[in-house]
Amino acid sequence: MTVTYTARVANARFGGFSQLLLLWRGSIYKLLWRELLCFLGLYMALSAAYRFLLAEEQKRYFEKLVIYCDQYASLIPVSFVLGFYVTLVVHRWWNQYLCMPLPDALMCIVAGTVHGRDDRGRLYRRTLMRYAGLSAVLILRSVSTAVFKRFPTIDHVVEAGFMTREERKKFENLNSSYNKYWVPCVWFSSLAAQARREGRIRDNSALKLLLEELNVFRSKCGMLFHYDWISIPLVYTQVVTIAVYSYFLACLIGRQFLDPAQGYKDHTLDLCVPIFTLLQFFFYAGWLKVAEQLINPFGEDDDDFETNFLIDRNFQVSMLAVDEMYDDLAMLEKDLYWDAAEARAPYTAATAFLLQQPSFQGSTFDIALAKEDMQFQRLDGVDGPLGEVHGDFLQRLLPAGAGSVGPLGRRLSLLRRKNSCVSEASTAASCGCAGAADGGGVECGCGDPLLDPSLREPELEPPACPEPPAPIPGPTPEPFTTVSIPGPRAPAPPWLPSPIGEEEESPA
């Protein structure tokens, strides 16, 4: 039922989409031709009545009605309402497809974790996958009309081989008025636990992996049920439908061609068929038809999901994976590129031109810079001493006017001047410093009057430390203290577990 045209648009070429306009199955023409003919018929009937049936006075009144409808029909926000609605429907449609229960991951885990080449192991694997397929069939026949027509009763499910008669009895004996698509998943988990107890599943990690994948499969079945149960709010669908239909009902009257002799504005041309009004109806009504077809993809429209095909494919593939393909491996051989330093698959003559194209290295790989632009530069503010940078930072933290008043501000200024002088002396650029002969302060030739030794703040002398007390006469203490080592512990009672590491412990 799905219309596939992917191969037709594999390459972009002149008129690539034009050939798709000639397709009939799944086309907009197939969906809309009845509504389009109905709209055109009503339009032509009103036009004929205006031209041939109405009296002159009635024609004047009809012309006023045409002008009124044409003026106020644009107040209906058709594009706005349709745009949001169709976006919501398409998003919902794709999410429903992503919730289709596919057994591919589950069958790989079953084939890798449930072991045994005998009939018992084979029975476990086939039954597990049959339960998964049964759960998918039960949920799809609940939401898809095509699947329900194929399996209208549980008897048809039993005859198709998805359920045994004993399982049907257990299924029908469950006292529940709700949908029981989840019952085969419970059977699956119980059978997997039984296989673990028998050793078919060798560890709990494998059982955990199997049940986690089963929960993913079951959650997809549950989401299909909820998508079928919770629809797009009816009021939204009604608003969109009423907006589109009322707009074109107004267009039936407002887009009529009037008598040019009356001199109405924008009515200087008299035609029989409204070409652009029909195109507008085709686009807007076709937009609504898109939402109408995609809102439930589990029907029997041309573009609905191939649910019966998926049931057949999933059942056959899952049985092949866990039965005939189980532990069936080809002999291990060295590949063609075993001794090759660089493995490269060959190209045909039709694709040999791809070898001439360079591999992508990154968007900045081919950027070229001038030689002078590639030289590292020292950052401004880092060349100075670290103390100067810290001093500037502390100065910014002080309140306004506090940098020059008080001992802290004077010390920060003095520290900044000292660092500046030492930095200039080390580079020998413009300042020469020499120590005084009498051991006084440093003389700098920087020309800064603030560096005069007489203006410096006197340094505080450290307080005199008291002399240490005289030693007390007495015996000289030993340099080390002797500590007695305890003997080995007594053996513990036999009913107590031995502490960790006691076997390696030896008496000191």
Curated annotation (Swiss-Prot):
Residues 461-478, 488-497 have a biased composition (Pro residues). Chloride channel activity is allosterically inhibited by GLUL/glutamine synthase (GS) which affects the gating at the aperture in the absence of intracellular glutamate. Inhibitory effect of GLUL is relieved upon increasing of intracellular level of L-glutamate. Residues 52-60, 256-274 are extracellular. Belongs to the anion channel-forming bestrophin (TC 1.A.46) family. Calcium-sensitive chloride channel subfamily. Pentamer. Interacts with GLUL; this interaction tethers a fraction of GLUL to the membrane, causing a decrease of cytosolic glutamine synthase (GS) activity and inhibits the chloride channel activity of BEST2 by affecting the gating at the aperture in the absence of intracellular glutamate. The C-terminal auto-inhibitory segment (AS) modulates the open/closed conformation of the channel and determines paralog specificity among bestrophins. In a closed conformation, the C-terminal auto-inhibitory segment constricts the channel concentrically by wrapping around the channel periphery in an inter-protomer manner. It comes from Mus musculus (Mouse). InterPro entries: Bestrophin (IPR000615), Bestrophin-like (IPR021134). It is a multi-pass membrane protein. It catalyses: chloride(in) = chloride(out); hydrogencarbonate(in) = hydrogencarbonate(out); L-glutamate(out) = L-glutamate(in); iodide(out) = iodide(in). Expressed in mucin-secreting colonic goblet cells. Ca(2+) binds at residues 10, 293, 296, 301, 304. GO terms for biological process: bicarbonate transport; chloride transmembrane transport; chloride transport; membrane depolarization; sensory perception of smell. The keyword Transport applies. Keywords: Calcium, Cell membrane, Chloride, Chloride channel, Ion channel, Ion transport, Membrane, Metal-binding, Transmembrane, Transmembrane helix, Transport. It is found in: Cell membrane; Basolateral cell membrane. It comes from the Eukaryota. This is Bestrophin-2.
